[in-house]
Amino acid sequence: MTTSLSLFQRAQHRIPGGVNSPVRAFKGVGGTPIFIEKAQGAYLYDTEGNQYIDYVGSWGPMILGHNHPTILDAVISTAQNGLSFGAPTALEIELAELVCSLVPSIDMVRMVSSGTEATMSAIRLARGYTKRDKIIKFEGCYHGHADSLLVKAGSGALTLGQPSSPGVPADFAKHTLTCTYNDLDSVKHAFEQYPNEIACLIVEPVAGNMNCIPPQEGFLQGLRALCDQYGAVFIIDEVMTGFRVALGGAQTYYGVTPDLTCLGKVIGGGMPVGAFGGKKAIMQHIAPLGPVYQAGTLSGNPIAMAAGLACLTELKKAGNAQRLAQQTEKLALGLKALADKHHVPFVVNYVGGMFGIFFTEQKTVSSYQAVMACDTEKFNRFFHAMLAQGIYLAPSAFEAGFMSLAHSDQDIERTLQAADQVFSQLA
């Protein structure tokens, strides 16, 4: 019995499913999850000492690599002064100022402790600001596990949303309209049906929870125009893409300006941090300035602020964003070339420091429907064969992969050598 297996069996006695977030259980790919003992740079080490090149990066935050000395020093030195105060600190001002300088659409920002808190709070703020109830989201996009966002499309061209999880009341879901990502007509239809009732539209600028689906040309700009036309707040959820697709986020990469932005992952440098921010006129409606309530015991935690400040300060150094994108492209194009060499039907999408792989006969994958038509069984075989060779990919065919600045040319070459063997087995 492996150490991971014994730990997993033990965990299931006291932790639901043996994990504290569902995707970690390997249900999407089968088998036993690997239990991690430590990480350094681009590598994970499991409880038996096996090394893996890591393309998950704690699901996105570890953009500098694991255990980066600058972040580690900031965390240790800050912790020596106290772990939490429940009072304002200079660090939270410094991080807020840095975020606003990097993301031009953000005039003011509120720190929270998770991406879910960020999206939940931004939507509440939009509803309070507009005095409307309905929201628009997109099928296949994930914005955390708040009740109003755990909603899927019903039957028909446009319906009121249906809960995607037990425990979400239908009365909550009915205020959420679910449209089709990369399909502006579906959004136009929603606004035409409820022209004076939609408080906001929230979108992942690159859909990273149906693997990696970039926006088609003009899609985000079309959403901006529709929100302007109907008086809805335009929210871009950059929890995954923020500082990763580009230093100013996907919004600067694609040239679109939201009213509100949600952040997470990279902004915490590996610590639990989220944030939402945007136009001053909207942000002034949040308490204590305005009537829309939002609070958090650990919001602005000094250790988390120090980690985020260290991470973003390092990331913004000249050449880092370009190198991250170059390494991602090198891996993505290398994988595609090897799949073609072995005649394995395969599509790879990539932008900035994130990528997605799809086993499919389709020429492109740019929609939720296209993702659902891909061969998940072949992905599962690829995942386990790569894992056996020391390459750790996301354990789900529907999750994006992440590059870090710690990944060397040698790491990518080793990954491609492993993929060459695995593609030959799949051919």
From Swiss-Prot:
It comes from the Bacteria. PROSITE patterns: AA_TRANSFER_CLASS_3 (PS00600). The modification N6-(pyridoxal phosphate)lysine is found at residue 265. InterPro entries: 4pyrrol_synth_GluAld_NH2Trfase, Aminotrans_3, Aminotrans_3_PPA_site, PyrdxlP-dep_Trfase, PyrdxlP-dep_Trfase_major, PyrdxlP-dep_Trfase_small. Its cofactor is pyridoxal 5'-phosphate. It is found in: Cytoplasm. Its EC number is 5.4.3.8. It catalyses: (S)-4-amino-5-oxopentanoate = 5-aminolevulinate. Its main location: cytoplasm. Gene3D superfamilies: Aspartate Aminotransferase, domain 1, Type I PLP-dependent aspartate aminotransferase-like (Major domain). One of its GO terms (molecular function) is pyridoxal phosphate binding. One of its GO terms (cellular component) is cytoplasm. Keywords: Cytoplasm, Isomerase, Porphyrin biosynthesis, Pyridoxal phosphate. SUPFAM superfamilies: PLP-dependent transferases. One of its GO terms (biological process) is protoporphyrinogen IX biosynthetic process. It is an enzyme of class 5 (isomerase). Pathway: Porphyrin-containing compound metabolism; protoporphyrin-IX biosynthesis; 5-aminolevulinate from L-glutamyl-tRNA(Glu): step 2/2. Homodimer. NCBIfam families: hemL, PRK00062.1. Belongs to the class-III pyridoxal-phosphate-dependent aminotransferase family. HemL subfamily. This is Glutamate-1-semialdehyde 2,1-aminomutase.
